[in-house]
């Protein structure tokens, strides 16, 4: 609860600045890259979120990280501020909130699409088009692969789930046969 409200405050402040400067999309992308980089490196995550390391040590790492990702000054300043306040552990929630605000601002929604095998470009585009019709918004797909689905696709947009997986169809058939 507290983490969410703190993350929301930071995200809203940065988002307001991004809107003012017309940099919503680039900052959203660079923040997502930053989040993925931090989450993809357990050692980096440990150093950034562990107060055992001095502020100077964390600041030096944050400076290198910002330079490596070529972050613009404002997103980089967010990193420095989080480091100075021992709140780098909030980064993931801040980025997620920023991206949600950016998507809303730009009139788009994100859909998590899970398939049994990787989707090719045309299949992914067809799914995005169908979901766009259903939601009346531009849909961005976050794709995942789960072989346990056996076949088909499960798409989640917000709280709505469209389940066209073979696994679910087989489970439904099994339930009907038991009756």
Curated annotation (Swiss-Prot):
Belongs to the ATPase delta chain family. It is found in: Cell inner membrane. Keywords: ATP synthesis, Cell inner membrane, Cell membrane, CF(1), Hydrogen ion transport, Ion transport, Membrane, Transport. The keyword Cell inner membrane applies. F-type ATPases have 2 components, F(1) - the catalytic core - and F(0) - the membrane proton channel. F(1) has five subunits: alpha(3), beta(3), gamma(1), delta(1), epsilon(1). F(0) has three main subunits: a(1), b(2) and c(10-14). The alpha and beta chains form an alternating ring which encloses part of the gamma chain. F(1) is attached to F(0) by a central stalk formed by the gamma and epsilon chains, while a peripheral stalk is formed by the delta and b chains. GO terms for cellular component: plasma membrane; proton-transporting ATP synthase complex. This is ATP synthase subunit delta. It comes from Anaeromyxobacter sp. (strain Fw109-5). GO terms for molecular function: proton-transporting ATP synthase activity, rotational mechanism. It comes from the Bacteria. PANTHER family: ATP SYNTHASE DELTA CHAIN. F(1)F(0) ATP synthase produces ATP from ADP in the presence of a proton or sodium gradient. F-type ATPases consist of two structural domains, F(1) containing the extramembraneous catalytic core and F(0) containing the membrane proton channel, linked together by a central stalk and a peripheral stalk. During catalysis, ATP synthesis in the catalytic domain of F(1) is coupled via a rotary mechanism of the central stalk subunits to proton translocation. This protein is part of the stalk that links CF(0) to CF(1). It either transmits conformational changes from CF(0) to CF(1) or is implicated in proton conduction. The keyword Oxidoreductase does not apply. The lineage of its organism: Bacteria, Pseudomonadati, Myxococcota, Myxococcia, Myxococcales. It is a peripheral membrane protein.
